[in-house]
Amino acid sequence: MHYARIASKLREKIIKFSGELSAGMPKVVCRFIAESLYGIQVRQSVRLTEIARSLEEKIPLRKTHSRLSRQLGRAGLWRKITHSLFRMSCSHIKEDTLLIMDLSDIAKRYARKMEYMARVWDGSEGEVANGYWTCNVVAAEVGEMVLTPLYSRLFSQNAPDFRSENQEIFRAISMVSKQTDKKGSWVLDRGGDSREIMDHFLDEELEFILRSKGKRHVIYRGRKDSVYNFALGCTLPYMERVVREEGKQEKIYFLEFGVRPVKLPGREDRLYLVVVRGFGQEPMMLLTNKPVKRSRKSIWKIIDSYITRWRIEETLRFIKQSYNLEDIRLLTYRRLQNMMALVLAVAYFAMVYLGLKTKLRVLARHVLTAAKRLFGIPDFRFYALADGIQSLLFRHQKGFDSFKNMINTQTSQLKLFDP
């Protein structure tokens, strides 16, 4: 298939996707979403100036920029896009689907005038910097490569509506669980074992797998002690070998693991402490309310579920790097939050939408071949996919007028449904 024809089909898919995403929204919002999804991918940037350039309008660039900025500042846009993505994605969520939550940062080291900017821990540099936090949820299946971005919200502890980090976590849990009918198991890293978070999961009858720091006190056989002390005394009768990619190398880990039934003080809910040795000097401690039997298969299922969580780190790097997220240059808090919803939608398009049907899978393979990389396509194919989309759309803009006509046709058809 000729690359120009693939580029044309990509534009058609972007239009179709944006139409599903913006269904029921006003005409001007539908057009804005379509243009933003196109611009972010063709320029691999979240800067409004770059998105405006991609549209190649026959008016001064500043006027296009002003129009995009005005629409990006719409109240309620983040929630509308997020709920539209829920509608599209929640059919993928099954009883055993993992709902992996991660708190990340967007460092803005040299920014001075961005609204409600706070001090955050810049994980890539290992130091405190100006910026914002993001709360992200990605759905995954154990043993499968498919990852489904579900939720992404930017927040700052300096914003007037901020209450606490836990409240941001509860907001994400509440919104996702409501849409999935409480299906899936939540997976959180260290810090997720705070008593407030665990009580929330138990009160809402949600399944979870949380990594413990070891300080949390639990009860085992009527005795109260720290998770760490109980982990040290746990028998580890089973062994398993795992291979983890670290950088460009593979590292082999030989793991020993076991389980103990425990309870939280003041609660009757049965929990299980899964203990794993082999990742380092200290044991890895997982707390879960999922039923666990004293068998290799049952215990390993919990460990394998948590290990799957590592893949979300690569997902977040993909989103940050492929769309240059830390180069975001928006002065108002609402626009920053709305842009995160658009980036989430772009990630969903690249990671999920292009793989939903056989024809789209074929298209995805063609796009992968268009991403010219020195060492070929990496195992994490979304990087190459994003590069391929950018390459095709950027190099084959001959049909861009037809793309704009498709936007106008779509928004005209949607006019009947405008509120």
Language model features with spans:
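Single, function-defining residue in the core of a domain
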Residues: 1-45, 54, 84, 97, ...
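Short, basic interhelical loop/turn and adjoining N-cap
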Residues: 54-67
